[in-house]
Amino acid sequence: MNGLAQRYLIAAVLAGSCGMMLGIGMGITHDFRLAPLHVHLNLLGWVTFAIYGLTFRALPEAATQGLARVQFWLAATGLVVFCGGLAALRLDYAAGFPFAVTGSFMTLGAMLCFGGVLLRAFAEPRAASHVLPAGRTA
């Protein structure tokens, strides 16, 4: 597995675990103010990062693009900045607003980079796979 796919899948598990622990904590305390944070950690962190990672696993040539590395850092940093800002806002700290907005735009930028990486990967001819009939060798 290439390093980029691995980093995304590890980040997905970390974000998903944080989202689940937050959900469990909210259920135990009956304090659901951070429910939007729980949702974003699970959907943006766990699901989106897992999709990114599995895509880069399936298209290893796409993971070698410089834009793919930029995309990872935009996505990872954007998630942390956005979630920090969102948590602050939900706990009535207005100072979280610029962080939530900045993180949102970073996350959007990461998705647009991902689209660019995919377009570039789909435009490049893939190496032909030479499958031989059973019993024949090259």
Language model segments and positions:
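Hydrophobic alpha-helical transmembrane segments of multi-pass integral membrane proteins
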Residues: 1-138
